[in-house]
């Protein structure tokens, strides 16, 4: 169906039903938005080696409706705390000169955090911490930065999908709406 055919189908649908075209466009937008999320999540997961499930939790799609035919993708771009990656295990250094477990490495999944330790914070949460310097309190929560990879992945994937998949999805949902109306 060319662009002329698409316009003709839209006119035909509008003459039969007022809600068919907005419903079809909302369906197409939602499909493309969900596909953009899943593709971007896959790219970020591959780049950062963070499990896909943890990255996908950070993207939410507010679906398009008949009245508002635009989908909103909200992404939590904050750093991912290392404790979320899975069960932590400390690989103790067994060398004689390393007293009291010095030079031990904390491992969580495929990640290694040298000098990392687990501690419960004042708010009751457990986190992986790391010393930043020698004095008493300078410690920080160990986290994996996701802001840059998430931003670049979504900025690259969305325009590509709008260009390639949106016309196909719109065509499919319009023909489906036409089929539903004609079989009534």
Swiss-Prot record:
InterPro entries: Phage_lambda_GpZ. Pfam families: Minor_tail_Z. It comes from the Viruses. It is found in: Virion; Host cytoplasm. Stabilizes the tail structure and acts as a connector between the end of tail and the portal vertex of the capsid. This is Tail completion protein. Signal peptide: none annotated. Keywords: Host cytoplasm, Late protein, Viral tail protein, Virion. Belongs to the Lambdalikevirus tail completion protein family. The gene is gene 11. The keyword Transport does not apply. GO terms for cellular component: host cell cytoplasm; virus tail.
